[in-house]
Amino acid sequence: MRLLTAMVAASFCSPAIAADYLGKVLAVSDGDTFTMEADGAKVRVRICGIDAPERGQAGYGQAAGVLSSMIEGKTVHCLQVGEGTVCDGRSRPTSRDRIVAQCFLDKVDIAEQMTRSGTACDWPKFSGGKYKISDTTCSRK
């Protein structure tokens, strides 16, 4: 009985159990965070390897708008860090109440599209430089 109780309790401590998510995007929070529905559950996702302006920072509205136009209401596929992402070995699989994941829309890397749009920066500490577009684009250390 103790084991069952511990297993049930542990399931509520983790934001998600699965590591591979396929679902519809419900809402975009900013240029690197969104909420999706996968397997009947709401999952908050932090896109790994990039950094976009937060609410109250310059560029927030543009970054959130670009991501929203790209994915809101659409089905995306997200792999949580540790499941073969560009951020494996560099990032934790969770951050606060979110999973950290590499996400795709129709097999197109969403993080790459955000950096190409100029609304998000490569964060090489976590991406290994995967999303660096050029020496003149922004880059987080």
Each model region followed by its residue ranges:
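Sec-dependent N-terminal signal peptides
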Residues: 3-12
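Small beta-barrel nucleic-acid-binding modules, primarily SNase/OB-fold domains
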Residues: 15-141
